[in-house]
């Protein structure tokens, strides 16, 4: 019963659309109706930038921090309280799932990158560091957020095998689930990348 309460709480917490809330409150803009219609930092930056570039950067950074924290902080607390790895991984998946399929937005949501990073920094920090380096490099070169995010995700998955080479493949199941969720949410971006229609943001 305790685990079910934790799972429900984490899903509801992960579902909070901080980007949407910040953009509505501070910029009086509904990012669900503009840009990519995503609730993440990239769309916050893209949409708010048209009206107030300085505010756009602040709101985008705040969105990243809050989306990151809503996964990282609960996991840190649960890890400190010595909950087992199975529960921690379930919490990580649910936080990301909540962000991508928010109950408050009729199961729509963001792309899961910041929330995923928040969850994984607690469980697989070296892999997240590797992914972050790739994200920065690809972002600097191509200036395309989705491309940088997908490259970082690929680096994360590959490095999870490199740094944990002695583990059996089925133990990587949560990593595959998380990767699948994020790739699924990026399908429109992937299509635009293929047809060279994706906008530069970074």
UniProtKB/Swiss-Prot annotation:
* Alphabetical keyword list: Cell inner membrane, Cell membrane, Lipid biosynthesis, Lipid metabolism, Membrane, Phospholipid biosynthesis, Phospholipid metabolism, Transferase, Transmembrane, Transmembrane helix
Its pathway? Lipid metabolism; phospholipid metabolism
GO cellular component, alphabetical, reads: plasma membrane
What's the protein's topology in the membrane?
Answer: Multi-pass membrane protein
Coiled-coil-forming residues are none
Please verify whether the record's keywords include Methyltransferase: no
Aminoacyl-tRNA synthetase among the record's keywords?
no
Main localization of the protein? membrane
Location within or outside the cell? Cell inner membrane
Q: Which GO terms describe its molecular function?
A: acyl-phosphate glycerol-3-phosphate acyltransferase activity
Source organism, top-level taxon: Bacteria
Q: Tell me which InterPro entries the record gives.
A: G3P_acylTferase_PlsY
* EC number(s) recorded for this UniProt protein: 2.3.1.275
Name the enzyme group at the top EC level: transferase
Q: What does the record give as the reaction this protein catalyses?
A: an acyl phosphate + sn-glycerol 3-phosphate = a 1-acyl-sn-glycero-3-phosphate + phosphate
Membrane-spanning segments: 3-23, 61-81, 87-107, 118-138, 144-164, 167-187
Can you supply a Gene Ontology BP term from the record?
phospholipid biosynthetic process
Against HAMAP family, the record matches this protein to: PlsY
Cited function: Catalyzes the transfer of an acyl group from acyl-phosphate (acyl-PO(4)) to glycerol-3-phosphate (G3P) to form lysophosphatidic acid (LPA). This enzyme utilizes acyl-phosphate as fatty acyl donor, but not acyl-CoA or acyl-ACP.
Quaternary context = Probably interacts with PlsX.
Known NCBIfam families for this protein? glycerol-3-phosphate 1-O-acyltransferase PlsY (TIGR00023)
**PANTHER family (UniProt xref):** GLYCEROL-3-PHOSPHATE ACYLTRANSFERASE-RELATED, INNER MEMBRANE PROTEIN YGIH
The record's comment on protein family reads: Belongs to the PlsY family.
* Protein name in UniProt: Glycerol-3-phosphate acyltransferase
Task: Give the organism the record lists.
Answer: Campylobacter jejuni subsp. jejuni serotype O:23/36 (strain 81-176)
Q: What is the lineage of its organism?
A: Bacteria, Pseudomonadati, Campylobacterota, Epsilonproteobacteria, Campylobacterales
């Amino acid at each position: 019963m305790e685990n079910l309460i934790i799972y429900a709480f984490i899903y509801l917490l992960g579902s909070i659309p901080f980007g949407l809330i910040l953009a509505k409150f501070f910029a009086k803009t509904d990012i669900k109706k503009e840009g990519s219609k995503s609730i993440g930092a990239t769309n916050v930056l893209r949409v708010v930038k048209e009206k107030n570039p300085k505010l756009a950067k602040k709101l985008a950074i705040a969105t990243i921090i809050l989306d990151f924290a809503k996964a990282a902080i609960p996991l840190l607390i649960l890890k400190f309280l010595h909950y087992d790895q199975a529960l921690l991984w379930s919490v990580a998946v649910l936080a990301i799932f909540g962000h991508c399929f928010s109950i408050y937005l009729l199961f729509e949501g963001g792309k899961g990158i910041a929330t995923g990073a928040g969850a994984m920094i607690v469980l697989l920090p070296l892999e997240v560091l590797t992914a972050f380096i790739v994200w920065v490099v690809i972002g600097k070169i191509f200036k395309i957020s989705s491309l940088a995010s997908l490259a970082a995700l690929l680096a994360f998955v590959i490095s999870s095998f490199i740094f944990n080479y002695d583990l059996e493949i089925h133990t990587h199941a949560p990593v595959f689930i998380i990767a699948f969720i994020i790739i699924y949410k990026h399908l429109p971006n992937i299509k635009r990348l293929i047809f060279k229609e994706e906008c530069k943001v970074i």
